[in-house]
Design a protein with these regions (language model features):
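Auxiliary Fe-S-binding modules of radical SAM enzymes
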Residues: 1-66, 72-73, 258-400
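Conserved Radical SAM active-site core
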Residues: 50-90, 97-205, 209-217, 226-234
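Short histidine/acidic/glycine/proline-rich micro-motifs that form metal-
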Residues: 151-153, 250-253, 314-315
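A structural motif
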Residues: 174-175, 241, 273
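Active-site glycine- and acidic-residue-rich loops that bind
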Residues: 184-187, 251-262
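Conserved strand-turn element in the central/C-terminal portion of the radical SAM core barrel
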Residues: 211-215, 219-222, 235-257, 281-283
Length: 400
C-alpha cells in the first residue's frame, strides 16, 4: 500500500515520489491563518483504509478509502450535458475560495471551509472498481465526465495516479469521456489521452478565469497559476487535442474589467483554446460564507458591494449578469471565439441530498452542451482570428 510509512502517527516522508506540481501557497483560512496540521481523522468514512499526512502536503490529510462504486448517475432532469460522472477525490487541495463543491464535503461530516481544502478523500481502488462496473452488460457506454465536482488532477493525483487507470478503463470499454481541470498534472497523461481519442470521443477542458497571477494566487492558492494553465492549453493543442476553457468565475470588481477580460480572452485565443464559456461568480450556501469571509479580509472595501450585488442569494443580480454577458460576448468576438463550451466541476454536486445538484439555469451564461465527435469532443468554433468588434466599451451598471 502506498505511503505506508506516512500513515497518521507514523509521518515519514517520501518526497521524491510526490507530485512535482507545487502549490504557490499553503492552505489558508480566510482569516489569513495557515491551516494547522489536522488532527488524525477518526471519522466514520465508508471504506476507510487509513489516513495519511506528509510534510510535502503541509496541512493536508488524505483519507484513503476503497469505494464500492465510482460511477455516479447525474440526477434525473439535470441540465448537465452528460449522465455519468466519476470523482476519484472528494475535497480539493486547489483550495479555491469560490469553489462551490464545498458543501458536498459536509455530507462526509467535514466542514465546507478548511476541511474541504485539507481533508481529501482518495478512492484508491477507483480504476479497479470502474472496470468491473463498465464490464456489466447493462452499461450503455454513455459519456462519463471527470472533474464535475472536484479536480481529478489536484496534487494528490501525482502520487496516487488514479487517472491513467480510469482513462484506460473508459477508453477500453468504448465509453466517451471528458475531463475538466485546473491541474497541469494533466500534461502527464497527454499521450494516454491521445491514444484514448483514437478509441472514443475525448473532451478536455481547462478552468481558467483570470490572467492576474496575484489575484489567482490569492483566490485559488493551491492551483497552478494562469501562465502554467495557458501553457497546458497550448500543449494540449499541440498534441492535437481539443481544449475548451471554463472562464468561471468572473469576480465582480476583481476580474471583470475590460482590461482583465481582454487579457483573458486574448491569452486564451493565443494559447489555442477551442472554445470558452464564461460566467459570474456563483455563491451557493457553503461557498458564500467562505467567500464572503475572504472578501471581508482581502478586499474589505468590496464586502458591502458584494452583499448588495448578491442580496444574500447565490446569484449576482440579473442586471450584473446581463452586463457581464455583454462584455463577454464582445471580448469573445474580438478574439475570435464563437459560441461556448463545457461545464464546470464547480457547477454540479453529486450528492442526491443536494437539491441544487441540478445545473442551475442561468448560472452559465451562454454555455452550450459539449458536442462530441471523434477527437473533437469539447470543441467549438474558435476561428483563431481576431474578429474585431467595434462595440463601444459599456460602462458597468451603476446600481452597485
Ligand atoms: S473550484 Fe475546482 S479546482 Fe478549485 S477547489 Fe473546487 S474543485 Fe478544486
Amino acid at each position: 500500500m502506498r505511503w505506508d510509512a506516512q500513515a497518521l502517527n507514523a509521518q515519514a516522508v517520501d518526497a521524491e515520489a510526490l507530485n512535482a506540481e507545487t502549490p504557490r501557497t499553503g492552505t489558508q483560512a480566510p482569516d489569513g491563518q495557515t491551516a494547522p496540521l489536522p488532527a488524525p481523522a477518526l471519522l466514520p468514512l465508508a471504506g476507510l483504509v487509513r489516513s495519511v499526512t506528509t510534510p510535502e502536503f503541509a496541512g493536508v490529510t488524505f483519507h484513503e478509502v476503497t469505494a464500492k462504486s465510482v460511477l455516479n448517475k447525474v440526477a434525473a432532469g439535470s441540465r448537465m450535458p452528460f449522465e455519468w460522472t466519476i470523482n476519484p477525490y472528494r475535497g480539493c487541495s486547489h483550495a479555491c475560495v469560490y469553489c462551490f463543491a464545498r458543501k458536498t464535503h459536509t455530507y462526509l461530516d467535514f466542514d465546507a471551509g478548511l476541511d474541504f481544502d485539507s481533508q481529501v478523500v482518495v478512492k484508491v481502488n477507483a480504476a479497479e472498481v470502474l472496470r468491473r462496473e463498465l464490464a456489466k452488460p447493462s452499461w450503455q457506454r454513455h459519456q462519463v465526465a471527470l472533474g464535475t465536482n472536484t479536480d481529478p488532477y489536484q496534487r494528490a493525483e501525482g502520487r496516487y495516479q488514479l487517472m491513467p487507470g480510469i482513462i484506460r478503463a473508459l477508453a477500453d470499454s468504448g465509453t466517451p469521456l471528458s475531463i475538466l481541470t485546473k491541474g497541469t498534472l494533466l500534461a502527464r497523461d497527454i499521450p494516454l489521452l491521445k491514444h484514448a481519442a483514437t478509441q472514443v470521443p475525448v473532451g478536455v477542458g481547462i478552468s481558467l478565469a483570470m490572467t492576474d497571477e496575484q489575484l489567482s494566487e490569492a483566490v485559488e492558492p493551491g492551483t497552478p497559476g494562469p501562465r502554467a494553465r495557458l501553457k497546458l492549453i497550448s500543449r494540449l493543442r499541440e498534441a492535437g487535442l481539443p481544449c475548451g476553457v471554463m472562464a468561471m468565475p468572473i469576480l465582480p470588481w476583481l476580474s471583470d474589467s475590460d482590461e482583465a477580460l481582454d487579457s483573458l480572452f486574448g491569452s486564451l485565443a493565443a494559447a489555442g483554446a477551442t472554445g470558452v464559456s464564461a460566467g459570474a461568480l456563483y455563491l451557493k450556501p457553503g461557498t458564500r460564507e467562505w467567500f464572503m469571509q475572504w472578501i471581508a479580509r482581502e478586499h474589505p472595501q468590496l464586502a458591502g458591494k458584494y452583499r448588495r450585488l448578491y442580496g444574500g442569494g447565490s446569484y449576482a443580480s440579473k442586471e450584473y449578469r446581463a452586463w457581464l454577458a455583454g462584455r463577454v460576448r464582445f471580448f469573445k468576438a474580438r478574439h475570435g471565439f464563437i459560441g461556448s463550451t463545457g461545464f464546470s466541476h464547480e457547477d454540479i454536486d453529486q450528492d442526491p441530498r443536494d437539491e441544487e445538484a441540478r445545473y442551475p439555469a442561468g448560472s452559465l451564461p451562454g454555455s452550450a452542451r459539449i458536442r462530441h465527435g471523434r477527437g473533437t469532443a469539447g470543441s467549438v468554433g474558435h476561428s483563431g482570428t481576431g474578429e474585431s468588434a467595434a462595440e463601444p466599451v459599456a460602462a458597468q451598471p451603476t446600481l452597485f
